[in-house]
Amino acid sequence: MNNSSLEHPGAIPGQEYRFDAFEDGKVLHKKKKGRMPAMGWNSWNAFGSGNTEQLTLEMAKCIKELGLDKLGYRYLVLDDGCYRNERVNGLLTNDEVKFPHGFRYLADRLHEMGLKFGMYNDIGTNLCAGAAVGTCGHEREDAGSYISWDVDFLKVDNCYYLWDDATFSDKENAKYVFAPALGKVVIRRDEVYLEEFSPGINMHIVGNGIHTEDIDGKLFFTHIGTFDGTGPAQTPVGVESGEVVLDADIPEDGTYDISIELICGRSSESGRGEWLQAASECSQTTQYQFDGLIDGKDCEGSGFCIKASLKAGRNRIRFMNHRRQENTLMSYAKLLEGLKEAAPDRDIVYSLCEWGKTQPQNWGWKVADSWRILNDITFAVGSDGNPGKADWVSGYTNSVTSQYNKAVVMDEFSGTDRGWNDPDMMVIGMDGLNSAQNRTHMVMWCMMNSPLMLGLDLRRVKKGDELYRVIANEEMIALDQDKLGIQAKRIYTDLIGAGSDKEYITNNDRVDILAKPLSDGSVAVSFINLSGSRKDEGYSVSAREIAEKLGDRMAGPDTFINAGSYVIRDLWTKEESKNCDGVFRINDLEAYDNYTIRIIPG
């Protein structure tokens, strides 16, 4: 394989990387299917860039002493801050102060303890903390290093990325993200006029996000690209990009000139870039006619012309820029390709951390086991002796509820045949959350099949104490790891009526009811009070309502509905009761708390 270019985005290597193939069911580079959400510990929330070999081994010792490995917490992942700031002879190298014995030594020690070893990198030129050791342009060498270090897990970030205006990237990279503003289009053959198309008349928008703007008295389409999902403003459900289309009647097969009035730019705010994709569709066949940057001299006016090979009949011409997603997919795929080339049979969990920027719920499953859905859950990370701080609510992504509110409506994107939505590492055990919030945080992540990556200094946990009882609740963990692999669906919220499973809601003054089907035919149901006030209105849901909402995702819905009785098991108190009417109730919920039960048909 060749490393990716540092000069320009690569050519699309095959149709399987295209936007049109995001739902084709075909993974890239033999990505493994069927893996359950990863469980373990990541160094970032606990220690930031200050993690060390000694601290990692102490965390491993805690995992063993607490018996957390027996519950599934086996991966210990070194996050940012573990490498030297520059490459040595083109290769990644350990920070000799923090990790004096090298990474293979640490991997061997963890493996001797029956644990797994994870590391971190970035598809950009630098890591998020600044070290100039990103994988871009070094994928083959880095893959070889990770194999030689016996890595079991790889988290890959998205800072300093060259082909998007990502975190710490050049803002002018927006030229790759958006198409130019698009005005009139004229189709000719042999300089003979065939047809003219104008915005809003016989040129139309499909999808979402495109604006129609008057620029100097002319109509143009702008913001032709993909929504940025890094922050909490954009719903993850539905079409996340837009195209401009026109339908042309072509008299005969041949080469035609498509002249386009356009205005280029390099600003996400203006929604004008310099990268254009144009494709024609005729008789269910798609042919890409152009996919590249517009040359500077063609960036304004009507001088840009595409030589297009068109078929006789009705042709749909599509103007778009899906490269924000396609480029990012290619970058993550390139490192996976390197890993598979270096060791085809190695089983490495691949965790994407591009913060939901390019809507990875659409394409991440092709290469990865999980994909982050937002920016970080906390920016107040800890250090040795400082537990760091987390929040329940915030105006941005840095809170438990910000992550939950997005992930809870993303159930359609996860599963054993795809991978898992990742609302970031857990913040249980950091300062800022009370006991009820810690419990509900654990419930949310387990019900949503999220990766369970602890982010606290485990020396703060004593076997049997309050923190331990949360992170070591075997019956909660069993929900997350249930082999059916179905993320819970929100079947009710008291803020709206219909559409509770797909409506993206950021108002936390509410109660949600989640239902998660399990492989043995039982169903987990959680009543969650997100608010800071006691809720005493009473809430209920019936077996029939649960089955109707979950549909064919359930194992044996008819058996569940028609059961004469049910055993109700409280997954926190372990108390059991019998239910004979098929209606499951809670009279009140304390602030931030939850009532989570397993309903077993009798």
Features from the language model and the residues they span:
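Extracytoplasmic
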Residues: A174-E326, K535, R544-S565
